Amino acid sequence: MTPSRSRVLPLFLACTALLVLAACQRAQAPAPSAPAVAAPEATTAPPSTPAAADGPVALKLTATDGSTLDLATHRGRWVVVNFWATWCHPCLAEMPALSELDQRRQDIDVVGLAFDDIASDALVAFLKQHPVAYPIAQVSMDHPPAAFETPAGLPTTYLLDPQGRIAKRFLGPITPQEIEQAVDAGTAAKS
């Protein structure tokens, strides 16, 4: 080999090795551990539904226990409307904390909307295994309630003010502390 070839060959081999490594890394997509619609962390988004601009959200459904879930009956209190599904791990992880919030705060009510294709009797059985203190109603994934935007990911949580208007929307898992901060900020802004 000539001196110039002896310098070029190692450089060529090193570049080739780097290209092979880079190609391998791009080909290795991480396997999803949860469905793609589950968001990793909560973000807030401004409400952009007609209900937010037109006044109180109107929604009346039958809860899984057979009672009527009517958002109008919650006027005067802050309402957390949580879209969730049985297959959504972040949704299930936040349910006990939302249940505790519902029981602890008299000025905050929580309602759950199961955005799931599960059969209604299977949903009732699921809730017996994962009980919560707040009412749950099932909503159709094909025809979600017009009062809210179709969830782009789960969980999606709306905070309604005491007049029933959308105050805030959270995309992804939410904590009671985040809800309470939003309630406190909303209450302070109105006083």
Residue positions per predicted region:
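Sec-dependent bacterial lipoprotein signal peptides
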Residues: 1-22
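Bacterial signal peptide processing site
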Residues: 24-27, 89
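N-terminal "domain-start" segment that seeds a small globular fold
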Residues: 32-71
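Short active-site neighborhood of thiol/selenol oxidoreductases, capturing the structured segment around
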Residues: 70-92
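Alpha/beta-hydrolase fold active-site loops
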Residues: 78-79, 108, 155
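Structural microenvironment flanking redox-active thiols in thiol-disulfide oxidoreductases
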Residues: 92-130, 140-146
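Thiol/disulfide oxidoreductase modules built on the thioredoxin-like
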Residues: 125-133, 138-184
